[in-house]
Amino acid sequence: MRLLKSHPLLKLVNSYLIDASQPSNISYLWNFGSLLACCLIIQIVTGVTLAMHYSPNVLEAFNSIEHIMRDVNNGWLVRYLHSNTASAFFFLVYLHIGRGMYYGSYRAPRTLVWAIGTVILILMMATAFLGYQHSPKWFDISNKGSISNKGNITNSLPPLLQRWGGRINKRLFNKNLVKRGYCTSSSLNSPEMSERLQTIINELGINPVYVYEDLNQPSSWKQILHDTRDLSGVYMIINKTTKDYYIGSASNNRFYTRFCNHVIHFTGSKIVKLAIKKYELKNFAFVILDLYPNVVTKENNKELLDLEDKYLKLLVPNYNILTEAGSSFGYKHTEIDRQKMKDLYSDARREKIGSLNRGKKFSPETIEKIREKALTRPPMSEETKIKCIANTRPVVLYNLNRTIYGKYSTILEAANAINCNEKTIRRALQTEKKLVKRQWIVEDFSDK
């Protein structure tokens, strides 16, 4: 006790908590204030701890919760302590108010204190409940795609609509309010979406903003043009037959341009072009994964690339050659470069180059010599074959359960064994998961 009254800091604490003069008729009902302070401290400590492990992303939110519950030391205790303390906090607040009303704490000379407490209560209620305006628990997406607010907390949120056109399946949100919607009961269960595509989306664990099928119909093209006007973000082209996909980004009003380049005009990804020619356009789907909320400029274009890069690393698409996002947004040729290009490729030179072989035909003698040269060309020697094989590497194919499917001396033999292209295996070896056709895992045997 001597230390409590002699130490400078402990003396102050002692004067307020132990030796403070109190009325003789005080009771335990005056403990609510200190209990509320304890709840507030617990909320802050547990909230900061949970924020260290929580990921506020629709693709990773549930996984981060499972990580907290399973992997973090006493994470389950921290999570339940945070949620239950919040309920206890408001319970004690109402008891605190009831005590004050019973003993007339709202009368003079404590009227100002009571008014300040009322303002604090209103702010707490606004913070606690209006924050749920965009929470999944307040929204119900029915099978018809309409979204209704179950909580009916505030009328400031305009209704989120979903429009359907023909056989096109898409989800539409109010672009002036939010760029993305999320709900625990997704409208991806809609009967308008093909079962195959729904399975792929569920396996990937994504929540797309727009989904378009039947890409072989011109009405789908018009719908994409209409819905994605002035929008920017990340898109995906999905092969519903092989479950392979391509991921890319588009700046403002460029979604339809990217769609046409890849799917219609075949001036985009060569891998996507070959896949569409092999599996037909009707077996592909165009998906808008995420929307960038701001107008893309040269200054903030890096943020859009970071968004694309996040999906590239998260989903690891098979149709993408590059594993990192890149863009030439904002690049312009200088006037000097433009003039050089004009000087090098003048109209006279273009005409001259184009007329080199125009109207020319090989003579029958030349055609016969070419044919004879091709037919008499000797086959590849054994020595050359050995050199070619020496430049390849042995690989091992595993099933998804890590059992060995087969060992092959060359990548070409492995490709023939599973009926795929040699480049498919080479691309898989460069990825982290090393998945081939989502059925096998390939590893370089030469490293072992």
UniProtKB/Swiss-Prot annotation:
Residues 230-321 form the GIY-YIG domain. GO terms for biological process: intron homing; mitochondrial electron transport, ubiquinol to cytochrome c; proton transmembrane transport. Its EC number is 3.1.-.-. GO terms for molecular function: DNA binding; endonuclease activity. It is found in: Mitochondrion inner membrane. Residues 1-132 are annotated as: cob exon 1 encoded. GO terms for cellular component: membrane; mitochondrion; respiratory chain complex III. The chain crosses the membrane at residues 32-52, 86-106, 112-132. CDD domains: Cytochrome_b_N, GIY-YIG_bI1_like. Mitochondrial DNA endonuclease involved in intron homing. This is Probable intron-encoded endonuclease bI1. It comes from Neurospora crassa (strain ATCC 24698 / 74-OR23-1A / CBS 708.71 / DSM 1257 / FGSC 987).
